[in-house]
A protein has these predicted regions:
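A conserved regulatory-domain signal marking ACT and ACT-like small-molecule sensing domains
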Residues: 156-320
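Alpha-helical scaffold elements within enzyme catalytic domains, especially in hydrolases
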Residues: 1, 119, 135, 198-202, ...
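Hydrophobic anchor at the start of a short beta-strand
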Residues: 8-10, 86, 143, 207-208, ...
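Nucleotide/pyrophosphate-binding catalytic subdomain
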Residues: 1-133, 225, 285, 289-299, ...
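A conserved active-site cap/scaffold subdomain adjacent to cofactor or substrate pockets
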Residues: 118-188
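Structural beta-strand/beta-sheet cores of well-ordered domains, especially the beta-sheet scaffolds
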Residues: 46, 84-86, 118, 131, ...
């Protein structure tokens, strides 16, 4: 198609493009990008098409990246080439304050800070993989998330010292939106280092685990929704943890992402929404930029709509 328009194109594999990864086959992480070949081809006037989702380790073996690998490849190349922005096209025209299939007419976000967007993706927003956004944040690359089929509507995701520009609400504190996951495990047990390490080793990283840690117990919320074999992971955890922990399966989680997760006003709005929806959460978890509750899968959509109504559609005023 490029040549039909009068251009000249060349296709390169991930290894040919200088993408170096670790040894985690099928779920490799990009360690470095050395785009010498890409730069030479660009200098020669070629349009360079790079195969995403792949690279090579230091022994020259071909590896494949995990979920979101193509987007991560694009961001990694953009950073290595010194680009200010990476445009990523998909079947949606950017980021919304909730899933349009659950909330009627959610707000379209024109701009979101990359830290808040990483949190949003970790808790279930599907537009971009959290690893892709985190890499863009580290490299200082802005992302334009746009639709392949639509107009110029998009969301700009960028690093900023000021989180407050990530506004869904037009006034008050920034609440990016409400998101959810359908399949999480709750692990409640002895607050020993072995328990936490066992869970992390099985699920593959700290980003999959939320923790509420009272004095002598751990209350871990583990995301297994995107793992290749969640049933096997659950069985392995039951076997390795034994009587030291109680595992609750088939929990849904609903999260708000905000610049002010520790503000009392946000907490009150969160609680009021749950009460209005007649939801008694099984567990509650807090991170720097999010509040999460767990509930039965049947309560998930009702909880999303209630939180969106209380914390996105109405501004949260700090100090009011």
């Amino acid at each position: 198609a490029i040549e039909e328009e009068g251009g000249s194109a060349i296709s390169l594999t991930g290894p040919q493009s200088g993408i170096l990864t670790d040894d985690q086959f099928t779920n490799a992480n990009i360690l470095d990008v050395r785009p010498d070949r890409v730069m030479r081809e660009l200098a020669a006037g070629q349009v360079v098409i790079v195969a995403g989702f792949q690279g090579e380790n230091r022994r020259g073996d071909i590896t494949t990246l995990g979920r979101g690998g193509s987007d991560t490849t694009a961001v990694a190349l953009a950073g290595a080439l010194g680009a200010e922005c990476c445009e990523i096209y998909s079947d949606v025209d950017g980021v919304y304050s909730a899933d349009p299939r659950v909330v009627e007419e959610p707000l379209h976000l024109k701009e979101v800070d990359s830290r808040l967007m990483t949190e949003y993706a970790l808790h279930g927003a599907r537009v971009l993989h959290p690893g892709c956004i985190q890499l863009a944040h580290e490299k200082g690359v802005a992302i334009h998330a746009s639709s392949t089929f639509g107009d110029d509507t998009h969301t700009r995701i960028r690093r900023s010292a000021d989180l407050s520009f990530s506004l869904a609400s037009s006034d008050g504190v920034s609440v990016v939106g409400v998101t959810s996951r359908k399949h999480r495990l709750r692990i409640h047990g002895d607050a020993s280092r072995d328990l936490v390490r066992c869970v992390l080793d099985e699920v593959g990283g700290e980003e999959a685990v939320l923790s509420a840690a009272p004095d002598e117990l751990h209350d871990l919320l583990v995301d297994i929704e995107d793992l290749p074999d969640p049933e096997r992971v659950t069985a392995n955890l039951r076997e390795s943890l034994g009587s030291y922990a109680r595992i609750t399966e088939k929990l849904a989680s609903v999260s708000i992402v905000t610049e002010a997760a520790h503000a009392a006003e946000v907490e009150r709005g969160f609680q009021a929404a749950l009460e209005d929806a007649s939801v008694a959460p099984i567990g509650r978890y807090r991170r720097a930029h999010s509040l999460t509750c767990t509930a039965s899968p049947a309560e998930r959509e009702r909880t999303i709509r209630a939180l969106h109504a209380h914390l996105v559609e109405k501004p949260v005023l700090i100090g009011a």
